[in-house]
Amino acid sequence: LETVLKELNRVTQGYFNNGSYDTQLNGIINNYVDGVVLPTYKSLMEKNTILYNVVNTFKNNPDNDNFEAACEAWLKAREPWEKSEAFLFGPVDAKGLDPNMDSWPLDQVAIVQILKSGNYDDLDWTDGDSDDAIEAAQNVRGFHTLEFLLFKNGKPRRVN
């Protein structure tokens, strides 16, 4: 969260000219960051930690109860992400996290191929990769990929 605040200060620094309104603007920015941005990112971190743990519980004990818990955790984790999209700055912007977490449209065919092959290398990319390779990796991971795996037609899937 400290990184977000530093990035916000860096980005907004150019807008200040030590004029008569700077004190008012500082108050507005501090209120916005402290009251909206940081609590939203904190909630995002906490709810995604829960989601990660619940998905791992399902992985280790695949039954319908654990699957439904994963679906519920996904819904709760998604909410702060949606809110945070109103202010994509800080590390989310600077590190390009948005397309890695929320890429759309999905490449459903590639997702199924990865699952069938067990070759998870297609999920990764590095800075030296082509734009096409990066986009291909981004289109098979993140919130929408997990949504595709957990839900069908808006309803949780069932474990067979």
Task: Show the residue positions of the predicted features.
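Mature extracytoplasmic or organellar-lumen-exposed domains after removal of signal/transit peptides
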Residues: 1-160
